[in-house]
From Swiss-Prot:
<feature type="transmembrane region" description="Helical">
    <location>
        <begin position="337"/>
        <end position="357"/>
    </location>
</feature>
<keyword id="KW-1133">Transmembrane helix</keyword>
<dbReference type="GO" id="GO:0005886">
    <property type="term" value="C:plasma membrane"/>
</dbReference>
<keyword id="KW-1003">Cell membrane</keyword>
<feature type="transmembrane region" description="Helical">
    <location>
        <begin position="242"/>
        <end position="262"/>
    </location>
</feature>
<dbReference type="Pfam" id="PF03040">
    <property type="entry name" value="CemA"/>
</dbReference>
<keyword id="KW-0997">Cell inner membrane</keyword>
<keyword id="KW-0406">Ion transport</keyword>
<dbReference type="InterPro" id="IPR004282">
    <property type="entry name" value="CemA"/>
</dbReference>
<keyword id="KW-0812">Transmembrane</keyword>
<feature type="compositionally biased region" description="Basic and acidic residues">
    <location>
        <begin position="114"/>
        <end position="136"/>
    </location>
</feature>
<keyword id="KW-0813">Transport</keyword>
<comment type="similarity">
    <text>Belongs to the CemA family.</text>
</comment>
<protein>
    <recommendedName>
        <fullName>Proton extrusion protein PxcA</fullName>
    </recommendedName>
</protein>
<feature type="region of interest" description="Disordered">
    <location>
        <begin position="84"/>
        <end position="194"/>
    </location>
</feature>
<comment type="function">
    <text>Required for H(+) efflux immediately after light irradiation to form a rapid H(+) concentration gradient across the thylakoid membranes. Together with PxcL, contributes to transient H(+) uptake following dark to light transition.</text>
</comment>
<keyword id="KW-0375">Hydrogen ion transport</keyword>
């Protein structure tokens, strides 16, 4: 059995280059499927028939697949040092027990789940070799790589060949037709660059209006509109689902880990006979205060019934049981802070793990929030800003900060330090107020000046 495990482990290590190459090849197939289906065989983002949100969605898919190709090829090169590759002309498939390729086939490649299957139907009869896969990957990724900078000649050109530089361009136009073609192709592939970085002879609003009219008069306008709506709906579902996942999953992990993992583990090490000295100073005060209240309550009831103020055996027995009950109660509360700290750390790790693996979803979520916020009116934006500033740095905010810090200290099992709380309230809201004003002056004043004007009018 041990030899079988070692044999399979050796096969898995030796097949690592082929599996890595398969993952890169499948990612290239998915890029090719998107190009053929949505861009007529051209590069992704090379035409203007799609809306802004749809184009951004395709760019996210493209970056994801290109990153998968880069990581897989890096693994292919690194593992090839330790494993012997087969003949480059032979079949380039991985072993049967490798599931990476199957997982790549099942992964969605774009707005439609069947995009990758259309690109794979042509290769079902014969699995390509290693060289064919590498050539196909280079062919797909070449159009998304920036061309290398042309070396400049150190010798100045002859005076007879010098031409006056046009006023509308900051670089001389190359005379070689091949260089012109490469530059045109580069500009076509980089059409998703920011609009502010390009120059145009006409105002961009006129060009956008003409492009919008052309799209509306196109025979495929309804299909494009439906496809854009489906893409927008998919992005909204992804953003809302990821936002709920970020909010709910760490909370569930914190609750279940506290009650079912760390709770029994911490209670197991709790002393069987706790003492009052093991409690924190705050819990000692609460236990003694509650005990004194219970004792005075018994004395008050005895006085109402005209009984002797001295406690009898029954009353002393009640006080003894109450003392044991309070000791057990506050001993458990004394360990609640440790349970909460352990559960909070685990929930933060889960939250960080979600952020780490959901980079594409974060970009979709940012786009969704930008669209949601910028879709608000100026009055709504100003109302939200005033609400947040008044809650966190307004006149009544010190009371809220005091309650928040006291609750946080109780949650972590820490003693409530009034000096720290008052010092925090005296400094941190001031920093937040400065940060809000800087953000309004630096960012919001440039993005939405009308919202800033409405904010000042409402605030005054």
């Amino acid at each position: 059995m041990g030899e079988s495990v070692l044999s399979r482990l050796g096969q898995w290590i030796s097949s690592t280059p082929l599996r890595s190459l398969d993952r890169a090849y499948e990612a290239a197939l998915r890029i090719k499927a998107i190009e053929d289906r949505y861009f007529q065989g051209g590069s992704i983002g090379s035409n203007g028939n799609h809306g802004q949100n749809t184009s951004r969605y395709f760019q996210i898919q493209l970056r994801q697949e290109l990153r998968q190709i880069d990581l897989s090829l890096a693994e292919f090169r690194a593992s090839s040092v330790f494993s012997r590759l087969p003949d480059p002309e032979q079949n380039g498939s991985g072993p049967p027990f490798s599931s990476d390729k199957d997982q790549a086939k099942e992964a969605p490649v774009g707005p439609s789940e069947n995009d990758g299957k259309d690109a794979e139907n042509g290769r079902q009869s014969r699995d390509p070799s290693i060289l064919e896969k590498l050539e196909f990957i280079d062919q797909v990724t070449s159009r998304y790589k920036r061309p290398a900078a042309q070396p400049r000649s150190t010798s100045p050109p002859p005076k007879s060949q010098e031409q006056p530089e046009p006023l509308t361009s900051s670089q001389p136009e190359p005379s070689d037709p091949s260089i012109k073609t490469n530059l045109a192709k580069t500009n076509l592939d980089n059409s998703n660059a920011p609009v502010a970085s390009k120059t145009a002879l006409l105002p961009r609003s006129i060009l956008r209006t003409a492009n919008q009219i052309r799209r509306e008069l196109s025979s495929q306008a309804e299909e494009e509109l439906l496809q854009e709506y489906r893409s927008q709906r998919t992005r909204t579902l992804v953003a809302v689902r990821f936002l709920l996942l970020l909010a709910i999953l760490p909370l569930l992990v914190q609750i279940f880990s506290k009650h079912f993992l760390f709770g029994p583990l911490v209670d197991r090490f709790q002393p069987r006979e706790p003492t009052i000295l093991a409690l924190s100073y705050e819990f000692q005060e609460k236990a003694l205060s509650e005990f004194e209240f219970f004792k005075e309550k018994i004395e008050f009831e005895r006085a109402l019934h005209h009984q002797s103020p001295e406690l009898d055996l029954e009353s002393e027995d009640q006080l003894s049981k109450k003392a044991e009950e309070l000791l057990q109660k506050y001993s458990r509360k004394n360990l609640e802070g440790l349970k909460n700290v352990l559960a909070d750390v685990l929930s933060l790790l889960v939250f960080g793990w979600l952020i780490l693996i959901g980079r594409e979803e974060i970009e979709v979520l940012k786009s969704f929030l930008d669209r949601l916020i910028y879709g608000l009116s100026d009055s709504a934006k100003a109302f939200i800003i005033i609400l947040f500033t008044d809650v966190f740095v307004g006149y009544h905010s010190p009371h809220g900060w005091e309650v928040l810090l006291s609750s946080l200290a109780a949650h972590l099992g820490l003693p409530e330090n009034r000096n720290f709380i008052y010092g925090f309230i005296a400094t941190f809201p001031v920093f937040l107020d400065t940060l809000f004003k800087y953000w309004i002056f630096r960012y919001l004043n440039r993005v939405s000046p009308s919202a800033v004007a409405t904010y000042h009018a409402m605030n005054d």
